[in-house]
Structures are given as C-alpha cells and as structure tokens.
Amino acid sequence: MDSADPQLNRFLQQLQAETQRQKFTEQVHTLTGRCWDVCFADYRPPSKMDGKTQTCIQNCVNRMIDASNFMVEHLSKMNGGHV
C-alpha cells in the first residue's frame, strides 16, 4: 500500500476487513450445515428431540461459539486490535 495516500489506505483496510467478515460468515454457514448433517442425519428433524439430539446440537453450538471466538480474536490480532 502507498503510505502517501491515507484515504486509499483506509479504504483498503476497510475492504480487507469486510472480506474477512464475509469469509467468517461463510464459515459459520458451513459449520451450521455440518451441524445439521451430523445432528439430523436424515435431513428432517423429529417432532420431538431426544436427549441424544439435544446433546448433539448443544455440543455443535458450543463448538461454533468456540470457533467464532477464535476467529474474532485472530482477526483482531491481524487488524492490530481493531475488528
């Protein structure tokens, strides 16, 4: 980047941050699809969830939260503390 044009630098940083947000959103959608595939293997949820399915969903959501927190922390470090 050309340090002589701070407005261009700011724009490029914002563009990079938005691209990273989009990638993160895509990853969340991918993980959601995977959780669905794992917890509802037959692609249709039962009329009433059993304990096994509830545990599966809970574990999957917890892993998604862990992944989300990791990604936010990683992006924050990459952006010098600004997400």
Curated annotation (Swiss-Prot):
A cellular component annotation (GO) from this entry: mitochondrial inner membrane
Pfam family, one: zf-Tim10_DDP
Disrupted-gene phenotype: Worms display mitochondria with an interconnected morphology, presumably due to defects in the assembly of outer membrane fission/fusion components.
Family: Belongs to the small Tim family.
Name of the gene this protein is made from: ddp-1
GO molecular function annotation: metal ion binding
Protein localization: Mitochondrion inner membrane
Keyword Transmembrane listed: no
UniProt keyword annotations, A-Z: Chaperone, Disulfide bond, Membrane, Metal-binding, Mitochondrion, Mitochondrion inner membrane, Protein transport, Translocation, Transport, Zinc
UniProt function note: Mitochondrial intermembrane chaperone that participates in the import and insertion of some multi-pass transmembrane proteins into the mitochondrial inner membrane. Also required for the transfer of beta-barrel precursors from the TOM complex to the sorting and assembly machinery (SAM complex) of the outer membrane. Acts as a chaperone-like protein that protects the hydrophobic precursors from aggregation and guide them through the mitochondrial intermembrane space.
InterPro entries found in the cross-reference section: Tim10-like (IPR004217), Tim10-like_dom_sf (IPR035427)
Topological type in the membrane: Peripheral membrane protein
Subunit and interaction comment: Heterohexamer; composed of 3 copies of ddp-1/tim-8 and 3 copies of tin-13/tim-13, named soluble 70 kDa complex. Associates with the TIM22 complex, whose core is composed of tim-22.
UniProt motif Twin CX3C motif: location: 35-60
Transmembrane segment boundaries: none
Name of this chain's protein: Mitochondrial import inner membrane translocase subunit Tim8
Domain notes: The twin CX3C motif contains 4 conserved Cys residues that form 2 disulfide bonds in the mitochondrial intermembrane space. However, during the transit of ddp-1/tim-8 from cytoplasm into mitochondrion, the Cys residues probably coordinate zinc, thereby preventing folding and allowing its transfer across mitochondrial outer membrane.
GO biological process: mitochondrion organization; protein transport
Cystine pairings recorded for this chain: 35-60, 39-56
Keyword field contains Oxidoreductase: no
